[in-house]
Design a protein with these regions (language model features):
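ATP-dependent adenylation/nucleotidyltransferase module used to activate substrates
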Residues: 1-146, 171
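Short, acidic/turn-prone active-site loops that include or flank metal/cofactor-
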Residues: 56-60, 156-163
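A mobile, often basic/glycine-rich helix-loop segment
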Residues: 145-161
Length: 174
């Protein structure tokens, strides 16, 4: 059983120190509406007022439905501004450009979405002098469930050592 109060305080202080030492003005994170993004958003907001979540749907009907609704609810509940950027046209452009050399090989396109999201987050972060927060948990890292140079790319990850069970435990506490 975690000491959730201590875990939250320690992680929030770590983020504050990171912002101070890097000189960044705030934090941006990809908000899919899931548990990991929710916890990252809340902890980031507890550390600084300058936090932005970016909702980045890309082709999937789920991205435009329940996931999007959850992402918006989290932003509203915790006063975290959300920006929505539909990456579908960008992915379609990639397919058009690459179709002659790759064809319609699904696996070749499988990791484009997380890499487009990473590029979007870093472009926004650069423009606004922000750090990109990672949203992957320890369970995902242990299983290799992330995309190299996609959702595995970030400036810091405040939940990388937490299991799914621990994330739910902290979310219930908050």
């Amino acid at each position: 059983m975690l000491n959730c109060k201590q875990e939250v305080e320690t992680r929030v202080e770590w983020i504050k120190n990171l912002l101070k030492t890097t000189g960044a003005k705030g934090i941006v994170y990809g908000n899919s509406g899931g548990k990991d993004c929710t916890l990252v958003g809340i902890l980031s907001k507890m550390a600084t007022d300058n936090v932005t979540g970016i909702i980045m749907p890309c082709e999937s009907s789920r991205n435009f439905g329940i996931d999007r609704e959850h992402a918006i609810l989290v932003g509203e509940k915790y006063d975290i501004p959300q920006i929505e950027i539909d990456l579908t046209p960008v992915k379609q452009a990639f397919r058009n450009v690459l179709s002659d050399s790759i064809g319609d090989c699904a696996m070749a396109y499988a990791n484009i979405n997380p890499r487009l999201r990473m590029t979007t987050l870093y472009a926004y972060a650069y423009k606004n002098n922000l750090l990109v927060a990672g949203t992957g948990n320890r369970s995902e890292a242990m299983m290799g469930y992330f995309t190299k140079w996609g959702d595995g790319a970030y400036d810091f990850n405040v939940i990388s050592d937490l299991t799914v069970r621990e994330i739910y435990e902290i979310l219930r506490y908050l």
